[in-house]
């Protein structure tokens, strides 16, 4: 059925959602290979797909201080996270980017284990490159916080506000 959002929060408009009876699959290759993504000047470009007008939809992760991904089972959370990771892998060199991946299901991010030596950061005590043991998540996040504080101290000493100014 049709869903009406009236009014759209923060805007003086009404939204009408009409289900697409003929949905089209948008391949990752088509958006990653698009001119818009390839020539993007964003610091951390993320491409998620295409808009209803068939334009490549992308944004700069640097402009988003926080991201919350939530939804019911089967609604595309993992697809969205994989699109974010893939976008960054295509645009950044391993010297510029490291991921800390937590995967309690043990199957969502296992495909990224092959990039362990290049893009995955892990705790000094070793272990798997993708954290699947929920008892190690707090220790891992604490280590990330220590690294974050160290970097903030470096920014402070350099009298800059962000890594781009550094």
Q: Language-model segments: which ranges?
A:
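Divalent-cation
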Residues: 2
């Amino acid at each position: 059925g049709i869903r009406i959002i009236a009014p759209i929060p923060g805007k003086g408009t009404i939204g009408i959602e009409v289900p697409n009876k003929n949905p089209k699959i948008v391949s990752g290759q088509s958006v990653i290979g698009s001119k818009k993504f390839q020539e993007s000047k964003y610091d951390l470009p993320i491409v998620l797909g295409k808009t209803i007008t068939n334009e490549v939809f992308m944004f700069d992760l640097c402009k988003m201080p926080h991201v919350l991904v939530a939804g019911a089972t089967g609604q595309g959370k993992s697809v969205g996270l994989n699109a974010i990771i893939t976008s960054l892998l295509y645009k950044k060199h391993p010297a510029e980017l490291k991921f800390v991946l937590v995967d309690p299901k043990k199957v969502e991010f296992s495909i990224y284990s092959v990039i362990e030596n290049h893009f995955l950061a892990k705790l000094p005590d070793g272990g798997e490159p993708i954290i699947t043991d929920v008892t190690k998540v707090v220790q891992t996040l604490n280590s990330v916080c220590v690294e974050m504080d160290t970097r903030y101290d470096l920014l402070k000493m350099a009298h800059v506000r962000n890594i781009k100014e550094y």
